[in-house]
Regions:
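Short, basic/aromatic-enriched C-terminal tail that caps enzymatic domains
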Residues: 258-276
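Active-site metal-binding loops of divalent metal-dependent hydrolases
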Residues: 8-10, 60-63, 103, 135-136, ...
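Residue-level marker for buried hydrophobic side chains located in beta-strands
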Residues: 56-58, 99, 130, 202-204, ...
Length: 276
């Protein structure tokens, strides 16, 4: 099994939004910001290949279809994910599975592409099954007031219309050694892939734990729709990660891609930085 991280680009998010009730005097010691309180966030994708009959992509960034509507976020260094895959010897048509942790624009925007001449929107990965949780899909179609601006129907409609959408209701095995587990809090039923290799499990933590600075369970983003649930789900993830020595992959951390975590008394902390 080959695991490769692809950074699809970066954007700015307000530090107060990212760290919620945590005061800047505390969070600024863990994560830098600019003069307007903007924190640079990555949009991280994970490519899993050399799996029998599978080429798996986890999340795919914001794409380019909605950059004008999202100009507030000041995107920069965006890459064409299809070109990045070609550099790794994989054409988009070879991707068999696209796992979407959730359907906020910064995680699924490259799921579809737009023909600028005809206006047609079509799946970026024409032969792939797109994995989404059922509750997340329902929330995407009928969003709550706090999430509606994070969803764009153009990112997913062509996938559903083309019969490429696979909805899951419970923890599911995608294939041997890759499990898809469901976590609530940030948004309904976020998918978190657990990738088991000999001697090591990698956890694509999504927005359950988006940054190494967010490892402390109380450090909950204001973007989390259900903060008490977020706390409980973070503890659930962290207890196992600390006990089993799992590697967390942080989808938004521009400075730390992966690390293990440790539990010291009743506190969780980032432990060893890991390179993939």
């Amino acid at each position: 099994m080959d695991i490769q991280i692809i950074d699809t680009g970066y954007f700015y998010a307000d530090g107060g939004a990212m760290f919620g009730a945590i005061p800047k005097t505390a969070w600024s010691r863990r994560y830098p910001s600019n003069e307007t309180n903007g924190c640079v966030l990555a949009m991280r994708s994970l490519l899993v290949s050399n799996v029998p009959e599978k080429v798996i992509l986890i999340d795919n960034g914001a794409g380019t279809k909605h950059l004008r509507q999202l100009s507030y976020y000041n995107f920069f260094d965006l890459v064409d994910l299809g070109e990045e895959l070609h550099k790794r010897g994989i054409s988009p048509g070879l991707v068999t599975d696209v796992v979407l942790t959730h359907l906020h624009f910064d995680h699924c925007g490259y799921s579809t592409l737009k023909n600028e001449e005809t206006g047609e929107i079509y799946p970026a990965f024409p032969n792939a099954t797109y994995w989404v949780s059922r509750k997340q899909w329902d929330n995407f179609l009928h969003p709550n007031a706090l999430e509606k601006d994070s969803y764009f129907i153009e990112n997913m409609k062509a996938i559903a219309d083309n019969g490429q959408l696979r909805l899951i209701d419970t923890d599911t095995e995608l294939c041997p050694d890759i499990d898809l587990r469901l976590f609530d809090g940030h948004t309904p039923e976020q998918i978190v892939p657990y990738i088991h290799t000999p001697g090591q499990t990698f956890v694509f933590a999504g927005d359950v734990i988006p940054l190494a600075a967010s490892v402390s369970p109380e450090w909950i983003s204001a973007y989390d729709t259900f903060p008490v649930t977020s706390y409980q789900e973070k503890v659930r993830m962290l207890e196992e990660a600390a006990r089993e020595g799992q590697v967390l992959i942080y989808c938004h951390d521009a400075y730390t891609r992966c690390s293990t975590v440790k539990k010291v008394n009743d506190f969780f902390k980032k432990d060893k930085t890991i390179e993939i």
